[in-house]
């Protein structure tokens, strides 16, 4: 049943993207954070869904999107230099095959970081991206928060939605991300327009903040605990 739910949601998301190509961008962000292909047992775990949506997002932007307000920034040029530097140091590493395998995810992440600002032309698009990223991270944070409140957790033993160290499912990374998005959650509670501020939005945002605050406790990861202390000071 879970596989059917993932497939139905992804196909609906991708289908809407053919009408509004910017939705491919949001769909890729969801896939990159939640990794539904790794949560699936058999229907989509053998399909390179991330690469497919990545390609659709770029092709959709090139073919359809309005580019009159597109601007390149110095940051994107620096990222291109970093991409070239990563490639050069990888092929010249002492163990190039192992290095290429270890950092295979970096290439797509850097290309996406260069490409993404080109698509964010309006405030609505920026807010849509923020909302999708928050809700995607919330899917992991809420699961971790509930398990921490119910059973405690422990370093390397708190299972989030996925029982392996992949992306945000690695305890140290997710605990740091959970604390880092708390200011963004509170900002959205006050200034969101897709879901305008009301008591339901406030309850969800406060509950999500509480779940995020529990993550460093449940994972017992130093990175998250340091982030929590710094956030409390600020």
For the regions a protein language model found, what residue spans apply to each?
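Alpha-helical transmembrane segments and their membrane-interface exit regions
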Residues: 34-36, 56-61, 108-114, 232-234
